Amino acid sequence: QRKQALEAYLRQPYGTEIEGKSQIVTGEVAEAIDGALPSLVRIFTGSDNIVVFEPQGPRDEASAKQATDYCNWVFNRDNEGVAILHDWFKDALLQKNGVVKAYWSDEENITKERYFNLSNDELAMLMSDDSMEIVEQDTEEFPILDQMGNPAFDQMGQPVINSIHNITVQQKKMVGKVTIENVPPEEFLISKKARTIADSPFVAHRQMLTRSTLTAMGFNKKQVEGLQMGDALAYTPERVARYAAGEQPYQTQTDDPSMQEIEVFECYIKTDIDGKGIASLVQVFYASNEILEDAKGKEMVEEVDYVPFHSICPIPIPHKFFGNSLADRTVDLQLIKTTITRQMLDNLYLTNNARVVAIEGQVNIDDLLTSTAGGVIRAKSQGAVSQLVVQNVAQAAFPMLQYLDTIQSKRTGVSDASQGLDPSVLQNVTAAAVASMQQAGAGKIELMARIFAETGVKSLFK
């Protein structure tokens, strides 16, 4: 279904096209999703704060304000907040569920600086910082002169030398922050028994990582070098539908072994690891049919407190993790409207370029096949050539198309009137009636926004 939704959104051909006939694909799925998305994003980003923490008591007011400021700063400044919301909501509207991943990431920040004319004391002070490393050094030595201009000597009779250093240093610092990223639907795995992420016995993030990235994450280098390359993720139905030929973002064939990509599963499993009979949540990294090990060769099975994934669904189905999307509600309408539109255009083509009936032996065929403005067709009798009349069915098709538009607006809550694009709504209608119609159309969108807020968005900021 997700592949079908993507193909419908991108207006891909159905495979039933006939050469010489209309091959148009209408865009009901895209219209519904792109029509609902601006309202949803505006609801969450219309104010200065995307999230506001409410104090439970008078003593909590200061901490609640601080939490509000911090979380909004992290979401909007440390991360691309609006872009994350856009892709999160769009995944949900298009592919049933949208998923984001929030986790703490430590990155090594490397900077280079150059210093000139440093004395020995200044150099020693600079290198007292353990994060500093000299990568290039040029030292000049010259004797110190006394007042008479002669070289000065110390108590041991050795000439006093002064050193000037020109150096290039490299500073390494670990920078940590909260990272929020969108997870493509095909990369997110969850148990079929799950109703929510929190109660699922198995959740995993399936992704392609280079050997270099795995080594930098602290996994055993020898094991990483022996992992088999894989590209199964590139051939999932959703990935094939999303990317055209040659657009795949992953490339397993490279001459540099460190840049070869491995299919890695970051798994969160509920299991009894200590033999006490109580399941706990553990994090396991899995690739090439083996559990990844740390630098010392020990399997990295770590007990964790939470699963870092947060999901939203626009039309949830009770007691199920996967609900419905707007694409599910409109994909059949797009097929029907595409069929009707194609037939209407084919009929219009035949009406404008009608076929000709000619009595054999009564008409010069060469004249008939040479279609020129004002041309002459030589015939032996006046009725030897006649035009085959094709009935125009467009007038009957337009009411059907309007009916389908009405069905779509009822299913999705998205219509030209709700978006302010239908001027006929304002004709001979009172202001109260217009407001009532707009509120009715916005009801479904507001419900989706409320569901988003109470599910994934709320859990993200906890």
Model-derived regions, located:
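Extended alpha-helical, oligomerization-prone segments that build pores/tubes and scaffolds
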Residues: Q1-K462
